[in-house]
Amino acid sequence: MEVRVEGQMVEGQAGDSVAAILQKALSGKKFKAVVAARALDSAEELLDLSSPVPAGCTGIEPVYADSPEGLQILRHSTAHVMAAAVKQLFPKTRVTIGPSIESGFYYDFDVEKPFSSEDFSAIEAEMQRIANAREPFTREVLSRAEAIERFKAMGEDYKVEIIEGIDADTVSVYTCSGFADLCRGPHVPHTGFAKASKLMSVAGAYWRGDEKNRMLSRIYGTAFADEKALAAYLKQMEEAKRRDHRKLGRELSLFTFKEDVAPGMVFWLPKGMLVRTILEDFWRKEHLKRGYDIVQGPQLLRVETWQKSGHYDHYRENMYFTQIEEDAYGVKPMNCISHMLIYGNELHSYRDLPQRYFELGVVHRHEKSGVLHGLLRVRQFTQDDAHIICAPEQLEGEILEVIHLIRDLMNLFGFEYKVAVSTRPESSIGTDEAWEMATSALVQAVEKAGLPYTINEGDGAFYGPKIDVRLLDCIGREWQCSTIQVDFTLPERFDLTYVGQDGERHRPVMVHRAIMGSLERFIGILVENFAGALPTWLAPEQARLLTVTEAGDEAVSSMLEEFKALGIRAQADTRNEKLGFKVREAQLAKVPYILVVGEKEVQAGGANVRLRNGDNLGLKSVAEIAALIRTDAEEPFKQGGMRYSFA
C-alpha cells in the first residue's frame, strides 16, 4: 500500500503501524516530536502511533507535541501519569475523570483527606520518575462486561458507573506505569513526553458537577512539549497573578463578590460603577452614531416563547425558570427573542431595512459553581447585544460593518486578535441550504475585511454559524470576546417579514452580534491587561490633588472646581499626612495625574504634576494640566473611527 505523509508517498505493508509509516517519511528529530497521527480518510480519526494503519487510508498527518492538538493529547496523557503517581503514593485513592483543558489538565480524586499544594512535591517527584522510565501507553479493547468486572475488582466504583452509562458494546482502556484507565485516547507513545509538567493548584469539585454528590479533590496541572515552553508559561502565570482582576478589583475598590449571598454575581462599588458607566455611555453613543436603535426587553418571558425559539430544547440547562401564578417563565439568557418581538411589533418595508437593535441587556446563565471566576465567568452579566434584521442581499455588508466595529474597538485598547469561523454543530436547527448560505456570508465578509481566519468545525450556535474573535492581552493570553452569528431559522420561527419592492412579504435574515461580549468579562480583561492602570479616559479618578500643608486647602478646593467644570474627574487629598504617603497612595490607586500643591504652587496658581509611573512634569497651570489630561484621554481614539467627549 502507498500512504501520503507530508507531501511524499510512503510504501508500506498491510498491518504496518502508524509509527512504522511515519518513521519512513520523517527525520529522526521530527519523528521524536510526534505524539499521535490523523488518518486522512473519511473518518479522519486520531490514532495512537502503535495503531495499525486503517484499511483504505490514503494519508497520515502527524500530530506534533507542540501543536494545539498535540498539546491536548500530551496534557491528557500527563493527567494519566499524574493519576498513576497519585495511586502509587496514595493507594486508597479512587479515580474519577481527568481531561485536558485549555491550558493544562486536571484529575478528580476521591480521597479521605483532600489534597493540598503541600502534596505537590511528592506527586511531582513520582511523576518525574514515571516520565524518566519512558513507560509505554498500551491500549486494549474490552467488552462492557469485562471492563465493569475489571474496574470493580480494582475498587474503582466511579469508573464502573461511567462504563454502565456508556451505550457501546466495547470500551478502550489505556495502561501506563501499572495504572489502567478508561479512555478513548489517543495517547502519547510513552511517559517520557510528560517530563515538562507542573502541578498548579487544587480545588474541590462535586462528582458529575452535582452539589448533591460527593465532593472530590481536583488537582490542576499543565504540560508542554519542552521545558522552555513550560518555563515561559509559568512566567506568564506569575505575571497573571500580579494582574489578577479579583485582587486588583479589591485593592482599587472597583467591585466585590458575596459568594454566601449571590454566587457568580457582581457587587459594583462606586469607582467600579463609574468605570462601567463611562464605558456604557461611550458604547451607546458609538452605536447611535453607527445607525443602531437602542431598545430594551423584559427579563422574563413565558416558557412557551423559549420552546418556540428552540432555546428550551437546546439551552435550558443553562437557564433559570420561575413560576408566576399559574404560568412558567424563563429568565432570559440572551436578548434575541425580545428584539425579534420588537421588530414584529409593526409592519416593515424593504426601505426600513436593515433594522439594527442594540441593548446593554442584563442576562442570566446558569454556570456550575466550580467554573465561576470573578468577572470572567459569572451567572449574571450585561451583554452589548445587537440584532440586525436585514434582507438577504444586505447580509454580507452588515457583517462587514460589524467586523469594522470590532476592529475599531480592538484598536482603541491596543489589542491584537484572532478570528475563527465556527460551523454547524451536531445539535442544530434549520435547513442545509440556510446553513450553507450563512456560512458563506461570514467567510466572504472576513475575507473582504482582509483578516486571516481559521475554521472551527462544528462549533457554531444551534441556530447558525458564527465568527468568534479572541483578543490577545499584553502577556499573550487569549480571551473569547466578540461574536457574529447569522440566523435564518429564528426569523422563520417568529414569522418575521418585510414588504419587498414587489409588494409581497419576504423573510429577513438576522445577525446576532456582541462586540465586548459580557461587559463584566471585558472590564475584567481590561483591569488585567492594564494591571489596574486603566487608560486616562476610562480611569474613575483622572487626577488627584494633594496638599502639602493646610495652607494649600483653599487653592486645592478652587482647582478641584475648575477641573470638574472642565469634565475632568478629580479628587482632593487634604489629610494631615506626609506628602510621600499621599503620593504613594495615589500611585497605588493608579491615578494617572498626581498634582502636588505646596506654597510655591499656591503662589503660582498651579500644581506640580507627577504621573502614576513616577515621571515628574514639573509646575503646570490648571489650564495646562487640563490640556495634558484631555490630550492623554483622546490619544487612543486617534487611530480609529471612534470619538471621546468630556462630560
From Swiss-Prot:
GO terms classed as biological process: threonyl-tRNA aminoacylation
Group of enzyme by EC: ligase
Cofactor(s) the protein needs: Zn(2+)
Record key words, sorted: Aminoacyl-tRNA synthetase, ATP-binding, Cytoplasm, Ligase, Metal-binding, Nucleotide-binding, Protein biosynthesis, RNA-binding, tRNA-binding, Zinc
GO cellular component: cytosol
InterPro entries: aa-tRNA-synt_IIb (IPR002314), aa-tRNA-synth_II (IPR006195), aa-tRNA-synth_II/BPL/LPL (IPR045864), Anticodon-bd (IPR004154), Anticodon-bd_dom_sf (IPR036621), TGS (IPR004095), Thr-tRNA-ligase_IIa (IPR002320), Thr/Ala-tRNA-synth_IIc_edit (IPR018163)
Pfam hit, one: tRNA-synt_2b
Chemical reaction(s) catalysed: tRNA(Thr) + L-threonine + ATP = L-threonyl-tRNA(Thr) + AMP + diphosphate + H(+)
Residue numbers binding Zn(2+): 336, 387, 512
Primary role: Catalyzes the attachment of threonine to tRNA(Thr) in a two-step reaction: L-threonine is first activated by ATP to form Thr-AMP and then transferred to the acceptor end of tRNA(Thr). Also edits incorrectly charged L-seryl-tRNA(Thr).
Protein name listed in UniProt: Threonine--tRNA ligase
